Design a protein with these regions (language model features):
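A short acidic/small-residue loop/turn micro-motif
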Residues: 20, 48-51
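Short, acidic, Ser/Thr-enriched surface-loop or helix-capping motifs
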Residues: 6-7, 36
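A short, polar/charged loop-to-alpha-helix boundary motif
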Residues: 51-63
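Short loop/turn motifs at secondary-structure junctions and domain boundaries
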Residues: 23-26
Length: 69
C-alpha cells in the first residue's frame, strides 16, 4: 500500500493494488474509489482532505508509514 498527498489539489490517494481503472465510484462528494474490470478496489481518493483531517494529522501519515508523492 502506498499513500500520496497532493498539497496543491488537497487530495490524498491510497494505492491498494496496481491495475487498470475500469471505473471510479463516487461514494461521497469527497470520497472516490477506483475499481478494475473484475471489481477489485485499486485505490481510494479523498478530496478536500484538509477539511476532513487537520493538517497536523496529515503530517503524521507521512511519519507513521511510507508515503509516495
Amino acid at each position: 500500500m502506498k499513500i500520496s498527498y497532493d498539497k496543491i489539489a488537497d487530495a490524498l490517494y491510497i494505492y491498494l493494488r496496481s491495475g487498470k481503472v475500469a471505473k471510479t465510484k463516487k461514494i461521497t462528494k469527497r470520497l472516490l474509489v477506483d475499481i478494475d474490470k473484475k471489481g477489485n478496489v485499486l485505490g481510494i481518493e479523498m478530496l478536500e482532505v484538509s477539511r476532513q483531517i487537520p493538517k497536523k494529522e496529515i503530517g503524521k501519515i507521512y511519519s507513521e508509514m511510507p508515503v509516495y508523492a
